[in-house]
Amino acid sequence: MKKLVSIAALLLIIASFSLFIYRPAKETIIFFPIHPHVTFSEAKTTLQLQPQKRDGKYSLLWSAASSLDRDAYLRQDISLLFADGRLVDRLAKWKTNSQTLTQEKIVAARDSRFFQAISFHHGELHEGEMITSSQTMTSDYLYVIDSPYSPLVSFHRAATQDEKEWQNVLNKTTAEFLQHTSESLLSHFSIQKQQYYSLYLPDLIVYNEQPLPDLSMEKTQEIIGKLWEGLYKSYFLGIKKEDGSILSPIGSTTPLILISKDYSHLLVLTETKDGEKIRLTQQISR
């Protein structure tokens, strides 16, 4: 009997230890120093309008895929889809000991809209005791015209006069909405915008290929990697308020990214579907 109790106790200790060291991959993206020789051989995000409408709604095929040039200890991809300045949906996938991830989703919508998707592709690499990472971003956008006066159509770049007019209308509507929301957020939190480099999350894609002002590409990638680490934890999985409660990000405004010009910190501002103003703060290591 004593022997059985001892074995049970030992198993409990082992189980407890296993729980302690286990890191749930789906709940974390962690930035590690960028591996200088590991790259993504392929990465893409795509938005495609499907030909048939159903119950008055059209469908978008939204996909995100990436392939690293070697197996990674942990592969993770996340993607965010915005329409007219608000978050519509999320995609996420992770896999251990893998190179490639592919995911897609059909999203139903109605009315004419401007869709923007941005994805973060990440690989965590273990070589002995050294842990490094590889990362990249991809994006896509799509204008969908759903009008009772014309056939359902979509385009990336306007080719006809009608498409150009619709593109201007949708761009203006989205820009004015985000400008109004941003001004309200900046005023609410008493933030001096001139002290920051500012951009909306989908525009972060430009820093795939160029550094932030007065920074090296290496430091830029570190800031971007840690920004996505924070976004995944505190926005993608649920907006974490100061009181500890969690709100769904669906319906929230496109995050405004504010990077302090002295590179001491960055802010992420958004407004939830219910109108609650949110500020996320992240310190930048020197």
Can you say where each PLM-predicted feature lies in the sequence?
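Short beta-strand elements
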Residues: 128-166
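Beta-strand elements of well-folded, non-transmembrane domains
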Residues: 55, 66-69, 80-85, 109-111, ...
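Gram-positive cell-envelope targeting signals
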Residues: 1-49
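Short acidic/polar inter-strand loop motif in beta-rich domains
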Residues: 111-116, 120-135, 273-276
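Solvent-exposed serine/threonine-rich low-complexity stretches and specific carbohydrate-binding patches
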Residues: 85-100, 228-241
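Exposed aromatic-hydrophobic patches
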Residues: 99-110
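Intrinsically disordered, low-complexity segments enriched in Gly and acidic/Ser/Thr residues
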Residues: 171-263
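Short, surface-exposed binding/anchoring microloops in extracellular/periplasmic proteins
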Residues: 39-79, 173-185, 189
